[in-house]
């Protein structure tokens, strides 16, 4: 279960905690995150030792837990040295409040610096990163994936279906589904994805999925999970049946010829600068 202190101002953690009470602690894995402001004060956000220690305690209270399996830095903090952040997270592991720690949406340079701090001070290793990754956004392939593979860092991806674009619910030339994210003007992320180019790609990907006898969502999730460095994907669902259908991706292997066809459709060009 993936959560964060900032989701609905702590209400999401409290709600999740109320549900988890029914289950033995060893039967589930739960994570939370820290960074975004939780109040108006200067120490109410960021990745300082003070905020991490205080907010982790609050997250544990919210969820009624003694420890978290995973604790993420929700974003990088330009105002706090990475050394302070990583050493604090190591202290939280030693204190038994978290088992592993990770970072989300950090740059390759920031991840590399964190790994350097771990090596220099012989700390508990950076276990995992949580970036956005899906067929339409492959930024992490340029540098981050290789960096993680070389250093034994896992990758758990959020938004693997591109805010619903890769479910096939948004079709070229068709009205937006009633009640979908794209019908809300405030949700700029999905609306920015609904370009003519992306919708054309979706139509072609739907044909590939049809030929393989799976949904576009299963195809998109399997495409991510085939990467050795990807340990899991974080999928949201508004209905239980959506989750059940998407779970089929864990056992589906995309044939090599279909992978080649997908690459042609996506037409991805790595962002590599020439030197000299």
Locate predicted features.
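A short, structured active-site edge motif that brings together acidic residues
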Residues: 26-39, 129-130
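A short acidic, helix-capping loop that chelates divalent metal ions and anchors anionic groups
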Residues: 37-43, 166, 242
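Active-site groove signature of glycoside hydrolases
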Residues: 60-81
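N-terminal binding-site loop/beta-alpha segment at the start of enzyme catalytic domains
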Residues: 2-28, 94
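Glycine-centered flexible beta-alpha turn that most often forms the glycine-rich phosphate-binding loop
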Residues: 1, 68, 101
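Beta/alpha (TIM)-barrel catalytic core signal, keyed to glycine-rich beta->alpha loops juxtaposed to Asp/Glu
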Residues: 80-266
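Short, acidic/polar
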Residues: 46-63, 111-116
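Active-site mouth loops of central-metabolism enzymes
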Residues: 38-53, 74-80
């Amino acid at each position: 279960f993936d959560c964060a202190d900032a989701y609905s101002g702590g209400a999401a953690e409290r709600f999740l905690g109320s549900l988890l009470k029914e289950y033995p602690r060893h039967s589930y894995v739960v994570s939370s995150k820290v960074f975004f402001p939780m109040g108006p004060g200067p120490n109410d956000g960021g990745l300082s030792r003070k905020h991490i220690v205080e907010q982790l305690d609050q997250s544990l209270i919210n969820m009624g837990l003694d420890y978290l399996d995973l604790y993420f830095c929700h974003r990088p903090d330009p105002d706090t040295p990475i050394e302070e952040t990583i050493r604090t997270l190591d202290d939280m592991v030693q204190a038994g409040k978290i088992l592993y720690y990770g970072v989300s949406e950090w740059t390759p340079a920031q991840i590399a610096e964190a790994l350097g701090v771990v090596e220099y001070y012989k700390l508990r290793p950076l276990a995992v990163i949580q970036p956005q990754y899906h067929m339409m956004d492959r930024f992490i392939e340029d540098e981050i994936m290789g960096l993680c593979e070389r250093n034994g860092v896992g990758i758990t991806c959020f938004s693997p279906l591109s805010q619903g674009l890769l479910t096939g619910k948004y079709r070229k030339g068709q009205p937006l589904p009633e009640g979908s994210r794209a019908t809300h003007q405030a949700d700029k992320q999905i609306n920015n994805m609904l370009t003519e180019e992306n919708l054309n790609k979706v139509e072609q990907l739907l044909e590939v999925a049809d030929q393989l006898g799976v949904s576009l969502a299963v195809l998109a999730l399997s495409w991510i999970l085939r990467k050795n460095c990807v340990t899991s994907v974080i999928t949201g669902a508004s209905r239980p049946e959506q989750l059940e259908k998407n779970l089929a991706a864990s056992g589906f292997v995309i044939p090599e010829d279909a992978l080649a066809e997908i690459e042609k459709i996506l037409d991805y060009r790595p962002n590599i600068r020439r030197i000299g």
